[in-house]
């Protein structure tokens, strides 16, 4: 797609500035050259049109890389309506280029909470009425939740949802356990080519970039505390170590904690003896008083709570690279401390009280992206080559679920198919192979004898489902 002029009469969009479309198109063309798996799928399935008839409601960060995803879905036959899953993550030139191509999109950087909710609604509604959508592509679960809560009739036609991130998967599993989930879901997050690329290697690239853009600080020689050591935490700790920081890790899971130790990070707790009693007395003030940077990576609530924020070193930087803004207790900061905007998505939080502040006061914290996703709030997120794997998984998951035609099944068949599952390993390997080819790599093929010896086929899949990469 190369159009940059909005089709005559097309008004089914809202973006910051449609005149940015040409800029967005130029960046999209570059991104396509860095997304070999996604573009490979576009070429492979173009003639087949496996998404013909698919009407996809999409809610994922409206970035340049997402523009390539959207146009791949459309190229394979789908119609889409789109919004962003974060109020700060949209790249306005990307949204403009999609609108200029005649694709409904409702997203701009710096939305208010009310505007965010409005954009979600417009994704679902066409001409004021629910669109006859039959697929969902989500990141974080807000769109899926809104459909279940307010537009359940739409779900009668929906074949399934593909979910991008850890937080959204947790919400889906919770809904499934409570009997509230109405459609099957593919857990894209736990595909190897998503979790190991996006969550780990992506954060390794983009966290330090966002912090440096937001603060202009030299990070070398300073002390950082990374809260959480899952895939996002692992990538984040590596990102800061690359900058020469002295990195400590806090974890609740003994296995992840062991991995942090094995990777050479000091395992600590912000709480004395590791126990949070909800009081200032339980805080390890000696530890937090030396921390220059704290990063939350968990997808959990209040992992950097009010008592920790009180004990942090003066002028420490605080940020989050998990999906939602509740990992850091920003509600406490808004209620009790004064906020001074330095520039968009960078605030000095004066710990001298909620009222007026002295600009020369040195008892403040630097909060990035208001506690929301820092790498997209203060920078441009993961590079195209990283998102290539994630979005190739999304395309294959959409094709897979759309082909299952869940909405057309009998009640008995629906009950059997109502699951939250990962993408079949063979498709995960298909994405990986396209990515390897994009790097110019050559994968060695097993001989028939070798394949028989380890109990697989020459074409794969090569590992059992329980294998941990």
Swiss-Prot record:
**In the record, what terms sit under GO molecular function?**
adenosylhomocysteinase activity
Q: Does the keyword Lipid biosynthesis apply?
A: no
Q: Which GO terms describe its biological process?
A: L-homocysteine biosynthetic process; one-carbon metabolic process; S-adenosylmethionine cycle
What are the alphabetically sorted keywords of the record? Cytoplasm, Hydrolase, NAD, One-carbon metabolism
What InterPro entries does the annotation carry?
Adenosylhomocyst_ase-like_sf, Adenosylhomocysteinase-like, Ado_hCys_hydrolase_NAD-bd, NAD(P)-bd_dom_sf, S-Ado-L-homoCys_hydrolase_CS
Q: Which Pfam families match?
A: AdoHcyase, AdoHcyase_NAD
Q: Which SMART domains match?
A: AdoHcyase, AdoHcyase_NAD
State the SUPFAM superfamilies in the record: Formate/glycerate dehydrogenase catalytic domain-like, NAD(P)-binding Rossmann-fold domains
GO cellular component terms attached to this protein's record: cytosol
Q: Which cofactor does it need?
A: NAD(+)
Annotated substrate binding lies at: 63, 139, 164, 194, 198
**Which chemical reaction does it catalyze?**
S-adenosyl-L-homocysteine + H2O = L-homocysteine + adenosine
Query: According to the lineage, what is the superkingdom?
Result: Bacteria
Name the pathway it acts in: Amino-acid biosynthesis; L-homocysteine biosynthesis; L-homocysteine from S-adenosyl-L-homocysteine: step 1/1
Q: Which family does it belong to?
A: Belongs to the adenosylhomocysteinase family.
* Purpose of the protein: May play a key role in the regulation of the intracellular concentration of adenosylhomocysteine.
According to UniProt, the name of this protein is Adenosylhomocysteinase
Question: Which organism is the protein's source?
Answer: Pseudomonas fluorescens (strain ATCC BAA-477 / NRRL B-23932 / Pf-5)
């Amino acid at each position: 797609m190369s159009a940059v002029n909005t089709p005559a009469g097309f008004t089914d969009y809202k973006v910051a500035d449609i005149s940015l479309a040409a800029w967005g198109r130029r960046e999209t063309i570059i991104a396509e050259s860095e997304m070999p798996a996604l573009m490979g799928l576009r070429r492979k399935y173009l003639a087949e049109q496996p998404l013909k008839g698919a009407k996809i409601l999409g809610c994922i960060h409206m970035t340049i890389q997402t523009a390539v995803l959207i146009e791949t879905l459309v190229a394979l036959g789908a119609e889409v309506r789109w919004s962003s899953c974060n109020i700060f993550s949209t790249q306005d030139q990307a949204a403009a280029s999609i609108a200029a191509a005649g694709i409904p999109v409702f997203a701009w950087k710096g939305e208010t909470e009310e505007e965010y909710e409005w954009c979600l609604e417009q994704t679902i509604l066409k001409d004021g009425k629910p669109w006859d959508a039959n697929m969902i592509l989500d990141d974080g679960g807000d769109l899926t939740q809104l459909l279940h809560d307010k537009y359940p009739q739409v779900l009668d036609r929906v074949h399934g949802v593909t979910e991008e991130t850890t937080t959204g998967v947790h919400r889906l599993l919770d809904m499934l356990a409570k009997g509230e989930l109405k459609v099957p879901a593919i857990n894209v997050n736990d595909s190897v080519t998503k979790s190991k690329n996006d969550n780990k290697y992506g954060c390794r690239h983009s966290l330090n970039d966002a912090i440096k853009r937001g603060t202009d600080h030299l990070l070398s020689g300073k002390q950082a505390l990374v809260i959480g050591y899952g895939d996002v935490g692992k990538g984040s700790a590596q990102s800061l170590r690359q900058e020469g920081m002295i990195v400590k890790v806090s974890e609740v899971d003994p296995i992840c904690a062991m991995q942090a130790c094995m990777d050479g990070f000091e395992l600590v707790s912000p709480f004395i003896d590791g126990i949070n009693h909800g009081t200032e007395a339980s805080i390890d003030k000696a530890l937090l008083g030396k921390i220059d940077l704290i990063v939350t990576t968990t997808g959990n609530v209040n992992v950097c709570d009010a008592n920790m924020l009180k004990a942090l070193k003066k002028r420490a930087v605080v940020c989050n690279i998990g999906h939602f803004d509740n990992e850091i207790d920003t509600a406490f900061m808004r209620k009790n401390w004064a906020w001074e905007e330095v520039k968009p998505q960078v605030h000095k939080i004066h710990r001298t009280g909620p009222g007026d502040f002295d600009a020369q006061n040195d008892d403040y914290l630097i909060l990035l992206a208001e506690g929301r996703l820092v790498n997209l709030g203060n920078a441009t997120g993961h590079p195209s080559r990283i998102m290539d794997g994630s979005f190739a998984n999304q395309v294959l998951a959409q094709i897979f679920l759309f082909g299952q035609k869940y909405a057309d099944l009998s009640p008995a068949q629906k009950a059997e198919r109502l699951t939250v599952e990962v993408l079949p390993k063979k498709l995960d390997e298909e994405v990986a192979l396209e990515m390897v080819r994009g790097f110019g790599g050559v994968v060695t093929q097993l001989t028939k004898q070798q394949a028989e010896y380890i109990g697989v086929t020459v074409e794969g899949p090569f590992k059992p489902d329980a294998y941990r990469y």
